[in-house]
Amino acid sequence: MAATSPHLTSIPQAVRVAASIDPSIDPGLKQQAIDYLTKVKQLSEETWQLYLQGAGAPGPSTTGRDGKEKLETDMRMFCLQVVDTVLIQKPEVMGADAVQGMYEAIVEFIQVEYIGGSCEGGQGFLRNKLAFTISQLFLRAFPSHIPTFLHPFFALLSPPTSSPPNLHPQLLTIRLLLEIAQEIHDTTLKTARIMTKERQERDGVVRDVIRSSGDDKTAVQGMLGIIEKGLEQMNSGNSSDKWAEAVDATLKTLSAWIPWIDLGVALNPTTLPFYHRLLHQPILSFRTATAGIYRTLVAKGIQDPSSRLQVLRVLAPVAVIDPLETETRGGKSEEVATFRASLGVVLSAYGVALIGISDNTEVAEQLRNEAEEMMNPALPLLLRFLSDRQYEVPLSVSPFVSDLLRIYKRMYKPPNPSTKAGQAPSPPSTLPQLSPERRQFLASMLDILIRQLAWPEDTEWEAPGNEDELDEDIAAFKNFRGSCRSFIESIAQIDKSLHTEVVARIVIATLDAYASGGGAAAVPWQQAELAMHLVYTFGEVSKNSTRAAFYELPPEMATKAARNKLRAAQGSGRTTPSSSDNVDLGPSSNNDRLEYEQFPLSPLGQLLTRCMTSGISSYPHPSVTLQYFEIIVRYIEFWKAKPETLPGLFEALLDGQGIHNSDEGVRRRCFYLFSKLCKDCRNDTVEGMVSPILDSMRDMMVINAELPPTDTPDEDPLIKATTGKSYVADQLYLFEASGNLVYLTKADPAKQMALLEAVAGPLLSGLGSGVERARVDENDLQAVLQVHHHLMALGHFAKGFPIVPDKLVELLPYTGPFKQMAEALLQAIEILKRRRVVRDAARFAFSQFANAIGTPVAELVPRFVSAVVTEFEPSELVDFLLFLQLLMHRLQGSTFETMDMLLLPLLSRIFTVLQQPVTGTDEAQVHARLKDAYLAFFTSLMNENLDGIFITDRNKPEFENVLTTLFNLTQDYSDGASQRLAFGFFSRSVIAWGTSPEAAARPSVFAESAMASQSKMVSGGGTAQPNAHAVTQEQRAKQCLPGYENFIYQRLLPAAFEVPANSQFNIRGGQLIVHEAAVLVRNTVQARGQEAIDFMLSDLLRRLNCPSDIANQLIASLTTQQAKDFKKTFFDFIKAMRG
């Protein structure tokens, strides 16, 4: 053993130092002690006998009966740990004699210490540690070495006769039995162990022998005896606390044994009445534990359905639970709730068991009917548990409810119509009707579930916001509300009309009570919020978000396909009358316009109308008004059809109930809802209200840049202020809304410019003042934050304007102002380019300006890029590459010069970062994200027809290095994402740089069947070319890069076959990679024509030992199949190559 400090010459001293919490002890000395003890454990095969003696020495006190000093508690614990180590980690070093010797030593120690001694001073943790060690020895010795291992311990289960009672021997045995049960059966504990086949077999053998030897019966009888004696003594008032501990521990252990012992041992004429008696004990913890035992018996896995039904009849859970539920109903204590939940679990297990029989078509019909008859009396009891307002109680019966609704859905739910495109829906299939009894039961359940959605009276409402810091009670309620909602939706799927009836009754009663003059005094806020919540979620049942959801349309008009069919019939002169003969379908057009208002309102439409006319929007509690605003936004299509309602909706959201609410949480949520309303509700009515709306919200658009306090000296206040959820982050929604509103006034350019100036002017002023302050004092962090916030606000304002095609940009009156904003941004970034938060905000704002006005900002891109390209942190490069991709897509060819200038500096920065060693998970994530980002950036260059950038005079010297780097990535089997992106790049490159003039001049080698629908439409003049094909094949041929065909044939095309065929390639997870390789093969044939086919048939496929008939089949598929079909063919070909 390694040399140690002279201070650590003995194990006891090392244990004392290692276990000490004295801060004055030298940390180095303490670590040395820990290392020393770890080494001792590692050598347990040599030292366990010594430490077994230490563990079996007399318990801790001054002196033992033999007059010798006893070991300290920490030392005894360490001795047991060493013994545990050899039993658990090195059992092979212990032969039969060693096992027998350890067993005898432990039994002797128990006899001396627990029968005739001080029971280790009564310290429960030492007793429990000893029990664990004995359990590990049991698993090593039983049944092969010591089949009677447990017998001496069973003898200890006899109730003590002494007064006061010495229960430590019994508690030790009870704990031992618990440890054994957990090791060989407890699924939770077993998941924490390394489970080998040998261990599983061993556990099965131990359980079997315990059952066959009768040890299970002995153990259960002994445990029941302790419980019986304990109850007797407690009722007499003798040592109640000690006996309560013993009974509690024994019930826990009995619960752990019953799942795997013989049913006849756990359930017989003696035990059943005993369980009933326990369930009525005054101590709730005993009752709860017994309910757990009862649940295990109910759920016992009996294969024969007849036998299982017989056991369930004997247990009679409904008869047992019913009076207990009645007795405890209304109890508010946590213990009562826990007991009631345990009863609910019993009922749930009973229901699930019966459903498992009644729903099993392989079971005899008589038994299935019996199971259903037995279940019916449980249903009223199920509803009583569901109606409990303590969440854990109704949640305890969730499995029963889920299974019940599942079988009802299968029996009664109408199937989803399988309508193909262009076809009218098929007529609904005939389903059995719900019986009156079942419908009443579901109505009662639905009513209970809906009322459970109401906020508890003792819970204070909070506006939605930071869910991470949600109050524990509110989080529990929202979780419970979600569970109830899922059950409600299931019932709605079974019987939609029932759901409509119950919801409408509750909502209308609430709205009528409020509207009739009672107001908030007649309708508590919880009830009002519930009504709004029901309206808000009502539309989820129909899964229809179109205007048709608000009107009752005839079946033949319910879908666009059906309306087209009806128009065709009307146009053909059909004379057979139908319910839609008097319906105005409107002019036939691609827009499928329909005058919905001629139809009666659907239930949802009626509820929305009731909400609007009831005045509930003025309810004096924010939970109700906020939910009303959520309804407005969710069902905006309804309000758009009723333009007369829109002014009132906007006014409600703009006043003190909405964005001006005194509650910050409500206000912030309303910022988002108002923005959503402005975005989704663009029509003439809103256009006329833009000016007053903007005036009403102007005071809410004042930006205050406030630095937050930092938690540590190293924390950056700027980063903290600009990440996560903040008031300003929500405030930005208002600027996006203002952009939407200003754009609506496009018909009046002068008005639009005035409104734009009214919004953007203060932002530019705030930006300018912040920049000036930061220029004067670069350490003025508040000024930096002000610049960030104002840039973000300008970006969100621009985001409210739509993307306009380049050909219309010159007609936009706001092109000039947005270009001025971009120039102000450039001035800011040039001064504050060293600030990460300013760079982030500038990228966002500039990208939004590019979206809003397009190519006019292209001339500013080089200046922007030059200002920031040298300032990026490694983690920021990813965001910058994404920013460049966005610019390329929006500005396309206008960015060529910028990208040409930027490519080499970018590559230098990227590869500098990627070449740095990875020292932790953060660096690994940065590397992975950066690799994906630059590959995606390269692919975007190809997609936007900017491939010429790679071969300009400036960049051509690095072209081969780029190709080599990317090609190496196709061979990197450890990084599938990079492989896929690299193959994707090369599949585009063969078109860009490898298209031969010969292939372009000759007819295509592809059959017409290989052309996609889009390609056929393009060639036929039926549609415009998408961007990816904006360059014709003839133009590509003129740009062909001399020598690139050699790279294709020597490297790329062989790699497309060889990489996925390699044994290192993960074929199961690499399907997308193989698909990209297939595209590379197909694009090569498209670019090179017959030459590529000849190369594959005469050279490549032969080198791959591909039989000629298989090779010909592959080429035939390649030239006749569409791309998506060839991908599958190629994947199958690769799998066949791999064998």
From Swiss-Prot:
Subcellular location: Nucleus; Cytoplasm
Organism: Cryptococcus neoformans var. neoformans serotype D (strain B-3501A)
Pfam families: Exportin-T, Xpo1
Presence of keyword Transcription regulation: no
Database matches in InterPro entries: ARM-like, ARM-type_fold, Exportin-1/Importin-b-like, Exportin-T_C, XPOT
Protein name, per record: Exportin-T
GO MF term set: small GTPase binding; tRNA binding
GO cellular component, one term: nuclear matrix
SUPFAM superfamilies for the chain: ARM repeat
GO BP of this protein: tRNA processing; tRNA re-export from nucleus
Name of the coding gene: LOS1
UniProt keywords, alphabetically: Cytoplasm, Nucleus, RNA-binding, Transport, tRNA processing, tRNA-binding
